[in-house]
Amino acid sequence: MLNSGSLIWLRIDYMALTMMGKKRGMIQLFDEKGNAIVCTVIQAEPNVITQIKTKETDGYTALQLGFEKVTGKTQHTIEARTGKPRLGHFKKAGVESRRFLVESRLDSTEEYTLGQEISVDTFNGIEFVDATAISKGKGYQGVMKRHNFAGGPASHGSGHHRHAGSTGMRSTPGRGLPGGKKAGQMGNERVTVQNLRIVKVDSENHVIVVKGQVPGPRNGLVYITQAKKLAKKKS
């Protein structure tokens, strides 16, 4: 259990299905009180079941989902873009080639079959979700942008306006300790945002609208799963 301000965060021990979708952009909506809320639109075309794992054959129970068909002008192009190992995998499942795969551990897979499509209706009745994506790459950045350092003096004549400052000590230990905050590659890493409230599930257009920001650029791949923590107000 984690305490944070006036909320108590409870870790939920369960296994939930993970779907894949594409971030289509951000919009502004109004809640029932007339307050403007910033939302992210995620379009999740039906994910297809490409493999069902069981304890007898694999040692654990899980579902593997595929997302976004591999496209090409000819069948040869599609097969070349898929690769022979995956071609055999999809052929065994009886589904068309998919670009992305994700596996979700579940307590039971009895209600699922190979080739079955999983739609956004899965999230009907769910209030919060977690979203995982690759964040936007910012390239090589300094410590002020990357780590929010204050920087040096801004006055004229100072030679270290945006420098990091001291990075170590003297003869003891005589080296810079590893793990220090320095300039370097920023972004382009796997980021998870937890407890995004679902504002709307549009089954007809395969869209989920969540309150808040989701990592990554427009049209970036997003993994969506039921929230692993639930927030409850302190009694």
Curated annotation (Swiss-Prot):
The family this protein is said to belong to: Belongs to the universal ribosomal protein uL3 family.
Keywords for the protein's UniProt record, in alphabetical order: Ribonucleoprotein, Ribosomal protein, RNA-binding, rRNA-binding
Name of the encoding gene: rplC
GO biological processes: translation
HAMAP family: Ribosomal_uL3_B
Complexes and interactors: Part of the 50S ribosomal subunit. Forms a cluster with proteins L14 and L19.
Disulfide cross-links: none
Region (Disordered): 150-189
Function: One of the primary rRNA binding proteins, it binds directly near the 3'-end of the 23S rRNA, where it nucleates assembly of the 50S subunit.
NCBIfam families per record: L3_bact
Listed GO CC annotations: cytosolic large ribosomal subunit
Higher taxonomy: Bacteria, Pseudomonadati, Chlamydiota, Chlamydiia, Parachlamydiales
UniProt name for this protein: Large ribosomal subunit protein uL3
Annotated InterPro entries: Ribosomal_uL3 (IPR000597), Ribosomal_uL3_bac/org-type (IPR019927), Ribosomal_uL3_CS (IPR019926), Transl_B-barrel_sf (IPR009000)
Top-level lineage group: Bacteria
Pfam families xrefs: Ribosomal_L3
One of the record's GO molecular function terms: rRNA binding
